[in-house]
């Protein structure tokens, strides 16, 4: 598993370190906000929003080499798509752990 793989993220930016730094800073700011939308969707028992928000984070995580977050997001996306909200709470909690770890790793990367 991987909290953050710089080589994957760099590959997706065409090896442009300036673009990578900009994207990482955006993720540090916007990722937790997007995670809040996932948690709100679960709290409101809105399966469609849960699926959509988890899907968005899955894509960002894949692009930035955050495999732990990608896998957790994918699992929640599938649960939302299937309307299995009672099972989604544990998945959303796993997403939160992965998000917090990713943001911490990016903070170290950007320091």
Spell out what each predicted region is.
Residues 1-111:
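Two-component system phosphorelay core
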């Amino acid at each position: 598993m991987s909290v953050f793989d710089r080589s994957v993220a760099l590959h997706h930016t065409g090896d442009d370190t300036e673009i990578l730094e900009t994207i990482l800073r955006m993720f540090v700011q916007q990722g937790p906000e997007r995670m809040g939308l996932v948690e709100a969707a679960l709290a409101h028992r809105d399966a469609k929003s849960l699926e959509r928000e988890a899907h968005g984070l899955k894509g960002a995580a894949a692009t930035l080499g955050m495999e732990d977050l990608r896998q957790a997001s994918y699992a929640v996306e599938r649960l939302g798509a299937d309307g299995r909200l009672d099972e989604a709470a544990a998945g959303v909690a796993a997403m939160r752990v992965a998000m917090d770890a990713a943001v911490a790793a990016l903070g170290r990367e950007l320091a």
